[in-house]
A protein has these predicted regions:
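Hydrophobic membrane-insertion alpha-helices, especially the h-region
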Residues: 1-19
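N-terminal export/targeting and maturation segments
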Residues: 13-82
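Intrinsically disordered, low-complexity segments enriched in proline/serine/threonine
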Residues: 8, 41, 112-113
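Extracytoplasmic electrostatic interaction patches
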Residues: 83-144
C-alpha cells in the first residue's frame, strides 16, 4: 500500500507533463505571445526555453523549411524581410541565447548574410532570421 502512493504520484506527473506539452506547444506560444502562426511545411528542429514560472526569459526555436512550400503572406515570408546587417542589440541577443542553450543547429556568430524581421511587444523581442544557405529560420525570443 505504501508503494502505491509514490507510483500514483509518478504517473500523475507523467500525465501532467504530456498534457502540458500538448496544450503549451511551441506553435501555441508563438501565437499567444506574438500573434504568429507557423505554416504547414516548417519542421521544428530544436526548441529551448528557460524554466520560469512567469514564462519570461530567453527562447530559441529553429525551423527547417520543407520542400516546395509557399510562405507568401506569412510572417515567415523572407521576400518581405529586411536584408540589412544586424544591430549591436540583435547580435547581443543572438550571443546571449546561443551561450545559454548551445544549440546543435545554431547560427554562426556573427551570422553570414541573413534575412531578418523583428517584433517588439510588451517589452519583449522576437528576432526571426532566415538563413537561405541552411534553409532554416531561427527565432530568438526575449520575454520580459
Amino acid at each position: 500500500m505504501l508503494l502505491l502512493i509514490p507510483v500514483l504520484l509518478i504517473l500523475a506527473g507523467i500525465v501532467v507533463y504530456f498534457v502540458g506539452n500538448a496544450i503549451f506547444s511551441t506553435e501555441k506560444g508563438l501565437q499567444a505571445n506574438w500573434g504568429i502562426s507557423v505554416p504547414e511545411g516548417l519542421r521544428e528542429v530544436e526548441h529551448y526555453e528557460e524554466s520560469s514560472f512567469h514564462g519570461d526569459g530567453y527562447r530559441l526555436t529553429i525551423y527547417e523549411v520543407q520542400a516546395d512550400i509557399s510562405l507568401n503572406g506569412t510572417f515567415f515570408d523572407y521576400g518581405d524581410m529586411d536584408r540589412e546587417g544586424l544591430t549591436e542589440a540583435q547580435v547581443a541577443l543572438i550571443e546571449n541565447v546561443t551561450n545559454q542553450f548551445d544549440p546543435k543547429n545554431g547560427i554562426a556568430i556573427p551570422p553570414r548574410e541573413v534575412y531578418k524581421r523583428q517584433v517588439a511587444k510588451f517589452g519583449g523581442i522576437l528576432l526571426c532570421l532566415y538563413d537561405a544557405t541552411e534553409n532554416k529560420f531561427f527565432l530568438y525570443e526575449e520575454i520580459l
